[in-house]
Design a protein with these regions (language model features):
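Substrate-binding/charge-relay-adjacent region of secreted/lumenal peptidase catalytic domains
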Residues: 1-82, 91, 96-402, 406-408, ...
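Active-site glycine-centered loops adjacent to acidic/histidine catalytic or metal-binding residues
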Residues: 405, 562, 630
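Active-site environment of divalent metal-dependent phosphoester hydrolases
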Residues: 409-410, 452
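Polar, glycine-rich mid-to-C-terminal structural blocks
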Residues: 441, 445-495
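An often Trp-containing, charged/polar helix-loop segment at the C-terminal end
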Residues: 516, 529, 574, 578-629, ...
Length: 647
């Protein structure tokens, strides 16, 4: 955020500053251990999910840290200090002169050159060395700086072009097809002979051996995240049900959870969203009679925000689920990040005029999210703070299922994407460009497969590739921010041992950084000539069908696709498994990756196809895990049997 100094606050020493001190959390070095303890199938504590109170207690700052900081404040005459409910904050108001003496600094008012807002800040502040280890962040603190330019910005100068780095993982491309094809598909909705042309619910059921659902266990509604004006409409749902799933009654619709001004539904069929209709029309045939809850976040102003750093409202969702996240301090960042996240109340004409919703609803056990961007375009601290929250919710039994992206090992090239002419990184624009937020190790991310022309649902699928859709292929690769997690290491090691990709590589992870610093992949790769990171978290974990999906949008029949389609399929299957476990008194499955990597036999291994990008063929789908289709596609009966066998 660009700022300019406006007023020296030394002229207003009688004024009071609201000060918040974010305390360093304890036990973050044990977070992975805690999560694996309840999610690894060999652990005696498998399935013993934590409460939110237990999570707060496990990571709260130590008593010695709290005592050290409060004693330091008291030595400067600051005694009236409040300790936040989430235990991560100390808060007090004090005269500006006293705060300046405490921190050995001078406060000024700084004006945001973008918004015109004015806030107190300083150029630097001092904390005694013995106190530093206990403090993560102090606000008001140093003025916020503009984001470091990305690799692509350094190479490609865009004149007069808006840089929408965080384009949806893939805007489902709804292709219109002939009335003859529609009549053929709808006249016999159980016909499997045309699944290489169009994927219907019958095709999905046949591919993954999914039986009809019978359970509707309370408090197990499947969560589907939507943003970017992706509204659902009843008319399209009813058209789909009538033609392809006549066992689902007309009028069946999701529950709307509208967060901070979000709008989930429209009565205007012309405003129906391709993403939302795709998600619902894939998920309903799998989970029905179980319900679906649409989680729509942020007001119209932010959903159409021209600021290219809007990050889909994931933090808005997490704030609404976990109130402590609203003020959670980590990696020198506290709460939502200005100019990246919305600020509420929003007084604009389309704004949500209420306060930020914090901890207002219980999360679904499974949440499907078909949105995202590129890892290199999101601040390091922002990513890691958010990733911590996914882990904490995993401890509470929540499964997050993300799409892996639709442009292979790169982003879409211009003009379809906004990471330069190749969609790749580095000075030569040839370094692979992994996606976010599915780079976080505590999520399950889903690649895409396809029934190739001339093949049937009774034969193995292949990795999705459709050159007619801007070279759409299954997103995959290796993170530059996170290391290979323990649960994945054996599978990744075997991939490199048996299926060496043959490309030059580099090894390293970007260091932690403050505020708006982006991952510098050029510096990370150095002079190695490498085009991918050999030691990063592998993407994706699993896969499901993601091309030629039959869908109704805006009253019209067409075909759609993307990992946006694969994700609700896989999430729906996990939700079905939760129904079965909950019905017999067991916990939801929560973080599923350790179980799947320990038991890859419950998935259909995909061994054909690639995910091209950056002037290469990308990686190849091979026996075992690979960075194209992960461990493979779901086999519902095998997965159900396995998860029911666990405590």
């Amino acid at each position: 955020m660009l700022t300019s100094r406006v007023t020296d606050l030394r002229g207003f020493l009688i004024g009071r500053l609201p000060v918040r001190i974010g305390l360093t959390q304890s036990n973050l070095d044990r977070a992975e251990e805690y999560l694996l303890d309840i999610s690894h199938p060999k652990s005696p504590n498998y399935g013993k999910v934590w409460t939110s109170e237990e999570v707060i207690a496990a990571f709260r700052p130590s008593e010695s840290a709290i005592e050290a900081v409060t004693d330091w404040l008291a030595s400067h005459g600051i005694i009236d200090v409040t300790h936040s409910e989430n235990k991560g904050w100390l808060a007090f108001d004090a005269p500006a002169s006293k705060v300046e003496a405490l921190l050995q600094t001078v406060y000024y008012e700084h004006e945001d050159q973008i918004t015109g807002g004015v806030a107190p800040a300083c150029d630097k502040y001092h904390v005694p060395k013995k106190i530093q280890e206990h403090i993560d962040y102090i606000t008001p603190g140093t003025k916020l700086m503009a984001p470091v330019k990305s690799d692509v910005d350094l190479k490609v100068k865009r004149e007069g072009q808006k840089n929408r780095r965080h384009d949806r993982v893939k805007q489902p491309a709804k292709q219109k097809f002939s009335e003859q094809l529609f009549n053929l598909l709808s006249s016999n909705s159980s016909d499997l002979s045309t699944c290489d042309v169009a994927i219907t619910p019958a095709c999905v059921a046949a591919l993954y051996n999914i039986t009809a659902g019978t359970l509707c266990v309370p408090n197990n509604s499947l969560g589907i995240f939507e943003a970017e004006l992706q509204y659902w409409d009843q008319q399209d749902l009813d058209l789909f049900f009538a033609n392809f799933t006549d066992w689902i009654p007309q009028g069946t619709h999701p529950i709307d959870e509208e967060i901070d001004g979000g709008i989930a539904q429209t009565d205007n069929i012309s405003l129906a969203g391709g993403e939302s209709m795709l998600d619902l029309q894939l998920a309903y045939p799998i989970v029905y009679p179980q319900t679906i809850t649409v989680l729509n976040v942020d007001d119209i102003h932010y959903q159409t925000w021209e600021n290219d750093t809007y990050t889909w409202g994931f933090n808005t969702l997490l704030d609404a689920i976990d109130g402590s996240y609203c003020t959670y301090s980590a990696y020198n960042e506290t709460g939502d990040l200005p100019n990246w996240d919305p600020t509420y109340p929003d007084p604009g004409p389309d704004g949500y005029n209420g306060t930020l919703q914090c901890g207002v609803f219980e999360p679904p056990n499974v949440i499907s999210l078909s949105y995202g961007g590129q890892e290199a375009d999101v601040p390091i601290s922002y990513q890691k703070r958010q990733c911590n929250e996914y882990l904490k919710l995993g401890l509470q039994g929540v499964t997050f299922v993300f799409a892996s992206g639709d442009s292979g090992v790169s982003n879409y090239p211009e003009p379809y994407g906004f990471d330069g002419p190749t969609g790749c990184l580095g000075p030569d624009l040839n370094i692979f460009n992994p996606t976010w937020p599915n780079n976080c190790p505590w999520l399950t991310n889903v690649g895409a497969t396809k029934v190739y022309p001339g093949f049937t649902v009774f034969e193995p699928e292949s990795a999705a590739f459709d050159p007619g859709r801007v070279n759409y292929s299954s997103g995959g690769g290796f993170s530059n921010v996170y290391p290979i997690p323990d649960y994945q290491k054996a599978a990744v090691d075997l991939f490199f041992q048996d299926h060496e990709p043959g490309y030059p590589y580099y090894e390293g992870l970007v260091p932690d950084a403050d505020n708006y610093t982006l991952p510098n992949v050029t510096a990370l790769a150095g002079n190695t000539g490498g085009i991918y990171n050999r030691i990063g978290r592998g993407i994706p974990d699993v896969a499901a069908n993601g091309d030629n999906i039959a869908v109704f949008v805006g009253g019209e029949f067409g075909l759609s696709g993307g990992t946006s389609a694969s994700t609700p399929i896989f999430a729906g299957i996990i939700n079905r498994i939760n129904d079965e476990r909950l019905a017999i008194g067991k916990s939801p499955v929560g973080f599923i990756n350790p179980v799947l990597y320990e038991h890859p036999e419950v998935l259909n291994d995909i061994t054909n196809g690639t995910n091209p990008g950056c002037g290469t063929d990308g990686f190849s789908a091979v026996p075992g895990w690979d960075p194209v289709t992960g461990l493979g596609t779901p086999n519902y009966p095998k997965m159900l049997e396995l998860f029911l066998s666990l405590p």
